[in-house]
């Protein structure tokens, strides 16, 4: 950061992101007194932003909670092993680096040229969940932001024929962990600008050589085009995800259509 204008911009943006982070945490009761929160730190802009917001909140919150930053070193070629330890030591943050060679497994299983992201993410999630349980972590914090949630909604809608996105808070399927997404109200534009102003030591996400998920790229481009024509489009879509009318959908599990009968008519 080189001038006062940048410092003022950073201060304003930081307050804005922290306000949104605090808002979603309060609305969904994400953090409780005595929590041990594991921040999954990949070295990307979003996870750095997440860690920074939780550290700021930790200083101001009326409750007490622990933070531990955890990175999974998957032994991808060219991964800069020293970057995260050096950064976290300088910040005085408790951290742990898990070393697992999932890269070799993924390369062996997935044919050349195919995206490895699906298998890689499933393996990563399992390893992180195991670590959380073994270390008495009460909340696993992920860096997904508003745009990730919207994109996932459209991916499921267009390609899976289902209406679902990413919840802000969930109990894992095996009921071993609670996952929270404190950046759910924050846009990708905000995390990108914040990471640039803070000059985080970003680690590229494509060290494995995997191609981008073309479906997600298509959805992201579509949403960005919509946003150009209507700057509030993403906000409106995001609002819709918490404004659902089950009786106006077709899912019999969500609304009892079957038992609506002529006896219910009131005239």
Curated annotation (Swiss-Prot):
Keyword Metal-binding in the entry? The reply is yes
This chain belongs to the protein called tRNA-cytidine(32) 2-sulfurtransferase 2
Motif PP-loop motif residues?
Answer: 42-47
UniProt similarity note: Belongs to the TtcA family.
Q: What else is known?
A: The thiolation reaction likely consists of two steps: a first activation step by ATP to form an adenylated intermediate of the target base of tRNA, and a second nucleophilic substitution step of the sulfur (S) atom supplied by the hydrosulfide attached to the Fe-S cluster.
**Highest taxon, organism lineage:** Bacteria
Pathways per UniProt: tRNA modification
Function of the molecule: Catalyzes the ATP-dependent 2-thiolation of cytidine in position 32 of tRNA, to form 2-thiocytidine (s(2)C32). The sulfur atoms are provided by the cysteine/cysteine desulfurase (IscS) system.
Signal peptide boundaries: none
Q: Name one GO cellular component term.
A: cytoplasm
Q: Which organism is it from?
A: Francisella tularensis subsp. holarctica (strain LVS)
List the subcellular locations.
Answer: Cytoplasm
Q: Give all cystine bridges in this chain.
A: none
Q: Which residues form a coiled coil?
A: none
């Amino acid at each position: 950061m080189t001038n006062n204008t940048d410092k003022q911009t950073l201060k304003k943006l930081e307050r804005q992101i922290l306000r949104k982070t605090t808002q979603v945490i309060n609305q969904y009761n994400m953090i409780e007194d005595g929590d041990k929160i594991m921040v999954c730190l990949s070295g990307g802009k979003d996870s750095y932003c997440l860690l920074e917001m939780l550290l700021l909140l930790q200083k101001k919150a009326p409750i007490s909670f622990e933070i531990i930053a955890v990175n999974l070193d998957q032994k991808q070629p060219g991964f800069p092993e020293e970057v995260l330890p050096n950064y976290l030591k300088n910040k005085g943050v408790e951290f742990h680096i898990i070393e697992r060679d999932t890269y070799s497994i993924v390369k062996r299983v997935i044919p050349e040229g195919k995206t490895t992201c699906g298998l890689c993410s499933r393996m990563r999630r399992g390893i992180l969940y195991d670590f959380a349980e073994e270390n008495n972590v009460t909340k696993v914090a992920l860096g997904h932001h508003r745009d990730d949630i919207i994109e996932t909604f459209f991916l499921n809608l267009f390609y899976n024929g289902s209406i679902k996105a990413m919840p802000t808070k969930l109990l894992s399927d095996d009921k071993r962990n609670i996952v929270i997404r404190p950046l759910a109200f924050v846009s990708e534009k905000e995390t990108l600008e914040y990471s640039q102003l803070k000059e985080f030591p970003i680690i590229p996400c494509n060290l494995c050589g995997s191609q981008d998920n073309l479906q997600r790229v298509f959805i992201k481009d579509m949403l960005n085009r919509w946003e150009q024509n209507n700057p509030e489009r993403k906000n409106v879509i995001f609002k819709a995800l918490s404004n659902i009318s089950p009786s106006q959908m077709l899912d019999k599990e969500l609304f009892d259509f079957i038992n609506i009968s002529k006896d219910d008519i009131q005239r």
